[in-house]
Amino acid sequence: MADNWNLRGKTQMLDDLNTPSLQCRVYDRIAVQDSMGKSHFYCLELSAGNTFDFGFCRKENVPSLLRDVMTMGSIRVLSGICDDLMVPTVPTVLWLKQARKYDPKHVIMWLENSIELTEEYKDTILRLRKMGMRFDVRVDAMGEIASNDEILACIDYLMVDFKRSAEFMTVIQSLRNKNPHLKIIAFKHHISIFSFTKEESRNFDYVLGTVNNFLLTYEIERPKWQHEMLRTFAQLYSSIYDVKEIGVIVANYPLMALAMKGMVASKHLTNLTIRKNSSTLGESQTLTQFDLRNFLAISVGYNLFTLTEKQSYEQKKIPFSSEFINYEPFILALNFAKIVDLMAQDICDDITAPQAFIAGFLRFAHVFLHDTEEATFAEFPLDAVASCYTNGGGQLGSIIRILMLLFEHRINDAMDVANNAGLVLVKERLYGYISHAMAWTDAVCSALNIIKGQQEE
């Protein structure tokens, strides 16, 4: 199997990964944010290669985790706009043997629930701690850690179930008396585009999931520029648009112009865009008209999201700076749309497949508008713009529903939709789509300067 995280398009054959159950694959990554929506690091969701189940990387999968995921190149992609990465796994001695291949100072190990502290695990934790690694554990599943002061002193973060946080506050305070630097991270069992409100997140140091943006309120109707962006979205999807008219719109919005300039100029993004899947290059080595149309759609979404964010701050009379922008919802939209695009290229016909990226991107229209789904799609009904959102929606509609359910961790529901639509979900391909989409999204964010100061690959 090819190493899907190699960012320069090369492949490395991994002859010893013929057993899917021993492979470690990235199912998802979730931002860990503060109450203002600033992402401090990402938490990986890992899966064995033979299943869509996710969670901790088991001991037998750690060799694959360190070889395939914890490389310098893949860590940089997975870290995205942050510097650090949280990895749910067990502290085997292999982490020490492979420490030169990654930087322990930028890794937070989320220790397995109710972990049994073997001599191997204790020694590894203590030695990794000296190298700068940080550790996290669930407060309701500390196992032997709670009674081992030496290991407890290595813990930097405590995870707590949001719904049960009140009942654990006494325990948390007791642990903080022993270890004052402990930070509390709240989590929910359900994942959505926005997992926490600002009010919910204020009671914790961090939350696992995206904090909602300020919603924009309207006195009578939306600003003219929002209507113009929504109309442009619809025109781009339909492919019925005047290039000169689009050019005028881009010229009138500096953010759109900067976005297009950055994306078109990025050789790395071009390379990732023209790749038909995660391991091979397409025959064409240049961007197609559909690729450029997708770039235009991204520039529309970026402009709409950023200007609306600015106006929402102004409405609340809060000083605004681009440094305050919580881009995570926009990043989620990019990543989701690209996975839809990659899956559609393998499944849909040549007429439908080119529509896939924008169709998936439009699923996040309410995010760009800083509005509720109900209000947005009542005014901007997706089924009126894209046929894949009508009843049934064909293969593309099924792909979007399946991937949205997988994104929300509703695995059984996703499998039911796939079976009813006659689609076979090949695990190896899906994990390939995910890894390719993350690398591509990272390249887009760099081109848009959402990831600051990153050099062209």
Can you say where each PLM-predicted feature lies in the sequence?
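Bacterial c-di-GMP phosphodiesterase EAL domain
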Residues: 4-106, 113-119, 328, 332, ...
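Short loop/turn motifs at secondary-structure junctions
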Residues: 38, 82, 153-154, 200-203, ...
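A generic secondary-structure signal
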Residues: 68, 72-77, 127, 174-175, ...
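Generic recognition of flexible, low-complexity loop/linker segments
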Residues: 75-76, 147, 246
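Short phosphate-engaging motifs
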Residues: 95, 167, 256
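The catalytic core of metal-dependent phosphodiesterases that act on cyclic dinucleotides
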Residues: 101-213, 352-355
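Conserved alpha-helical "signature site"
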Residues: 187-457
